Amino acid sequence: MKTANDMIPSRMADCPPATLLADLHAAVVERLGAEARALTLERVVLGIFFTGVRLSNGAGGLCATPVKGVPEAVCCPSSAKAMPTPGKIAGRRAVDLLDDLYRTQDLRRALAIATLNALAETLWLRDGPPAGVECLDGDAFDALKIEPGRRVALVGAFPPYMRELRRRGQPFSVLEMDPSTLRPEEMPFYVPAERAPEVVPLADVF
């Protein structure tokens, strides 16, 4: 009988231990079992803002497209490594694309994350939400009860959330790897991502 470790590619060994992607990869593949190995990619779209996949069971997954990875994908010498091979993606087993979770090429990794999200959606649709989890419609940000004066730490520069926090006058910090994604008026809230260990413990909401 195969275990989850048998189905995780060796490339995971080169990945930092206990990362969120590695943990999710292992958990989803193990819980789906044979179903994960039977699912194939039906459609893939690499868009300007989002990369999306649809699996053979109709489940879908998204990932933000890393636009800074596009230049290397359109340069002939590097495009073969940077891009999944067009015309040869549909019909591939979803679990095989998960190898790219551990690659350094941004576009390949984005496609792998979207595929992993589609497999996670498959698990959610099959088994329902975990015990104790309440599912609500609408924007998760609206469901947060953030009291005035409570400090917020945003992991990633999400323009609608930053705009709303600024409108409320809420104190907040934005942990972001790429400061160029922030507008000039948002830069006072920017904190380099590597400072997360000192910023997150000081936040009331993150």
Model-derived features with residue positions:
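Structural motif
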Residues: 151, 204-205
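Electropositive, gly/pro-rich neighborhoods at or near active sites that engage anionic ligands
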Residues: 2-167
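Conserved nucleotide-cofactor-binding alpha/beta core module
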Residues: 159-203
